[in-house]
Amino acid sequence: MPSINENEDIINKLKMSTITDDIIIQPSIDDLPYEEDVSKNPYSVNCWLRYLEFKQGSPQKQRNYIYERAIRELPRSYKIWHQYLLERTLAIRGKCILENSFEAVNTLFERSLVFLDKMPRIWIEYCEFLMIQEKITLTRKTFDRALIALPVTQHYRIWNEYTKFILKRSIPSLTCIRVYKRYLKIQPEKVEEYIEYLIKIKEWQEVVNQLIKLLDNVKFKSIKGKSRHDHWLQLCEILSSYPKQITGVDVDSVIRSGIGKFSDQIGKLWCYLSDYYIQLAQFEKARDIFEEALTSVGTARDFSFIWESYTQFEDSLIAAKQEILEEDPSEDNLLEFDIIIERYENLIQRQPLLLNSVMLKQNPNNVQEWLKRVNLYSNPTPNVKMIIQTFTDSIKSIDPQLAKGKLSTIYSTFAHFYEQNNKLSQARLIFENSLTVNFKTIDDLSTLYCDYAEMELKHRNYEKAIEILKRGTVSPKKQNTIIEENEPVQKRLFKSIKIWTFYVDLEESFGTFHNTKSIYEKMIQLKVVTPQIILNFAKYLEENKYFEDMFKAYEHGVQLFLFPHVQDIWITYLTKFIQRYAGMKLERTRDLFEQVLSKVPPKESIIFYLMYANFEEQYGLARHSMAVYDRAAKSVDKEDRFKMYLLYIHRASEFFGVNQTREIFSKAIEQLPDQYVRDMCLKFADMEKKYGEIDRARSIYIHGSQFSDPRTSMFYWNTWSDFEKLHGNEDTFKEMLRIRRSVQASYITQNPTLALLNKLNNKDDKDDKNQQQKQQQQQQEKQQQQQQQQQQASTLTKSKPVTVSLPETIQYNKKIENDDEINLDDDEEEEEEEDQLAIKAFPKTLLKII
């Protein structure tokens, strides 16, 4: 701050400059009106401004003279002063800053501030003008004077320019720090900008001090959107990177407190702490920090982060030691190098175990990680002590209800470990202890019982194995006892199919028939069976010649299960029953078929109908067989009915002839879905045609036409057309064409989209005309050969020759006896040009008849 004496010197200097610049300039004739105006109204700002506007193009000295007169009369006029200062600064723009004109403008600014010290715009422009002149000290003092003169509410305008000024490279850092500290007292939220500046000038001690203050202030809100977490990381990074430049801070405790607070950046913070000691060349301490970090982190991500830093640290030590060895290959240096290499190799070997420890710390109930740890101790050289310790720790640590994976695998592997080391008693003890654990699922406990029994089987203790499984299959005395899901697994174990299956397999192999049979019956009683178990039981009884018991087993199976699971049981049951009794027990067999047909869904019923019909054909009556086929055609799934009707018709024709098949054809056409009626009509008409029933066949074609769209069912209409050519006449052929047009029109009405597609496809039909023309030429060649054959045939007959009018492509004469012969003339083209049919020659058999 300037003293009182300095202010007096400035005022005296201003007075002397005013006297020096007070040059009298005579006004011109044009100036007289304005002179008269300002003389009459010397205190009017507008009068002076009008005068200055009139003198816009005059020399600067004349304008300066007018400005001086104006401010002498109106020393506190902001408009006049601001305009005067602006003109003076613009007038010297581009000149050397060492010229006296710059000092004159500085003096003018000082004169204005004597009267306008409360105007921040004047202060700002003055300071900006001083910054152009690179007068650092004077600029700083002027900013300070502005802060003293202006009220606090306007300080922000000064500080915005002040901070820009001090951030210049030419400003000493100590000055900047002092100014910024004053600034933070007014606006403490700008501390982040201050920290960025300190980082830029590498004042690390002050950076740490400001960050600590910032973190101590719980109410601080970042204007840059940073969180306390970000500031913590920034502080730890700076502390670890520049430990020699920072004093008075317990870096170890600061970083460790951050590790306790921010769990998502634990790995990075541990690396910062180790880097701190590395920068201080305390390598052993840094290594201890790394080891502590690897054993304390709880996530694989943090572990990998620390592991990378640790290995890079060891690599750098090895590289540095190699350089030392090249310069001084002494024994001490070589020994130290060997120690570093051995330590590094040991670290690499321990990596899987260290990572496994982290994973187990993250979830101690992870079964797979415990087993992985056992494998790590087993390879390459088994460490028996650590393997046993790992198994023991896993059993103590894992909560059976929270286990991730099959906990039974831990106990089984532990027991087999003792077994492989010829300690069978210890293995039995492990299994016995495991059988009392309250596992999460029955499958775990049943697996242990089975593994226990398998171990005894390996050592040929068959009775011991059976006794173990017998213990596991003990059921409640009361059959209807309800076991809740929250009961221990030991009380629910008798419901395990796995242990029962193993038990019955052992009894079949090493036990008696009656014991095995009783076990199967117990399983059926407890309903712990599958369809395959029922089939196995029945097969076992069959092998031992207990046929009625076998059928009882099948009966139990069909009562326990529903379709589709029971299908194999029913098929085997019926097959075995028919093989056993053939036709001796017809009614009982029929009852079985009726029983299964009353339960089977339509989609799966076809096989049983076929078995039933085949049985009736072999051992029953053909009439009964036809009744079964008739039921099947009505009851099977819609997709199977067409095949069923075809089989029905085939068998009926073999047993009863054509008359019976006509009735079946009629039923099929009535009951089949529309997509199958067309094919059935073709087969029906073909059958009638074979037996000479032409009118019946034509009626069938007419009936089936309503299900045949001419655009998609070309085969149907071609077949009918060929039929009419061979067996019809001109009227019937025209009737066929009429029906075809009618059906096509009805389908177009029902499905206009298909009609549109048909029009689009017509374009492709035009491309086929060339091929059709080639075919017509080939037909003409065949026509000539056919005419020669007909002429030869006409010489053999004495009947009246009849000329048949055909399309232009084919014409020939032939002799016929009936007057209903088809006479295809040009009328067909008049009715519909699109219905051009391929004309075939008359069969030789028909010529012989004629």
Curated annotation (Swiss-Prot):
Transmembrane residue ranges: none
Compositionally biased residues, Basic and acidic residues: 761-771
HAT repeats: 25-57, 58-90, 100-132, 134-168, 171-203, 281-316, 477-509, 511-543, 545-579, 584-618, 692-726
Gene Ontology cellular component annotations, sorted alphabetically: nucleus; post-mRNA release spliceosomal complex; Prp19 complex; U2-type catalytic step 2 spliceosome
Compartment list: Nucleus
Entry superkingdom: Eukaryota
Entry similarity comment: Belongs to the crooked-neck family.
Protein name: Pre-mRNA-splicing factor SYF1
Organism the protein comes from: Dictyostelium discoideum (Social amoeba)
